[in-house]
Amino acid sequence: METPELWQFTSSHFNEKARWALDFKRIPHVRHSLIPGFHVPVVKRMTGKTTVPVLKLNGAAISDSSRIIEALERAYPEPALYPADADQRSRALDLEDYFDEELGPYIRRWIFHVILPHPEFVRAAFVSHASKGAQLAHRALSPLFGAIMKRQMNINPISAEAARGKTMAAMDRLAKELRPSGYLVGDRFTVADLTAAALLSPLVRPPEFPYKAALPLPEPLAKIRDSLSTHPAYRWTLQAYAQHRGESAEVAGATNLSRSKVDASRAATTER
């Protein structure tokens, strides 16, 4: 069996979801870290799409974090992220879908509204792994990236406030859905827990998150984080990371890819 290869953005919650599944299952894999915008020709050649993460598994290029986990469950069934019990499995997949649709896009919009006025932090979070040349190119293009991201992701004060509300609603639901075991389904960690925790990671910033920005959080984001630190979903996310994030299963051979030609117009809607 070929070593799986993951094409990713380092600081992305949907990418973290796929990455965590690989690590949880202890699957040795190679990671290719991309820069938003610069990633387009690389990913489009593999899938015909422009979204990451993309997993190359047994010759197939799979996009979408949920489809990646589904493929990993078939190829590497243990340790399982899908419950064996049919009712529990249905609940786990329903919750995965809920957090994918009702949390993932909205927490992203809210967080980007907060951090885009701080381009140095954005570069530290998304580009610090890249070559110096790629970092310089991104720096030169950062005003363009910011404007395009605002337009394509519909980022403005009104939409950001609505996204904040959706994020809070998802956090409240997470707290209500927790079983007495402390998990969302049954008495063990499943795809539902992994999805909820990974998608909350941009806000919670767990210490176990594998890629940390080289700069401190911008003050507005730090204040938001502090204000939510007593929320049950926030505390639960920290616990989920502490108990289940584990060590990386990445193996040698990873690359940091960039291209001189960047499609900035596609930089904003590129993860799922």
Could you describe each region identified by the protein language model?
Residues 1-134, 244-251, 256-267, 271-272:
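GST-like domain detector, emphasizing the conserved glutathione-binding G-site
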Residues 6-10, 56-60, 95, 99, ...:
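Conserved aromatic-histidine-acidic binding/catalytic patches
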Residues 65, 95, 104, 191-192, ...:
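Short runs of predominantly hydrophobic/aromatic residues within well-ordered alpha helices
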Residues 87, 91-94, 162-169, 173, ...:
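A non-catalytic, amphipathic alpha-helix used as a structural packing/dimerization or gating element
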Residues 104-214:
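GST-like fold's C-terminal all-alpha helical module
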Residues 155, 159, 221, 225, ...:
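Short amphipathic alpha-helical segments at helix-loop
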Residues 190, 211-219, 254-266:
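C-terminal/domain-terminus segments
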Residues 199-247:
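Short His-centered aromatic/hydrophobic patch
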